[in-house]
């Protein structure tokens, strides 16, 4: 297995940035309540699970792109990542609109999670649109003419 960071295109890098945003958002305050700030872990629910799955999908997309020698796995990872990214965007919007337990206002973590979900979706979509097979070495060397023929 050879790792080549040159294979990572703009789409994979955008999705990776989105995954980092989602992961960081999990440890930042999401809501401000009269009793203090609440983060993703204290308001844990299905939306947080979906955000974590989308971040894992974006990481899988990036790792598949830089480690695989063919386009098959990165393309399928991109397709799944688009689906997970779309679901994560909807989940993040729900978490922005539906505040738990008397939360007065939103904090940076909720907005960072939303931005990360949008970046994952946009990056995965761009990854699917960018078809450059020249980034991958051919599986077989090109056929050579028999000796004596040109």
Positions of the model-derived regions?
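Compact integral membrane and secretory-pathway proteins
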Residues: 1-150
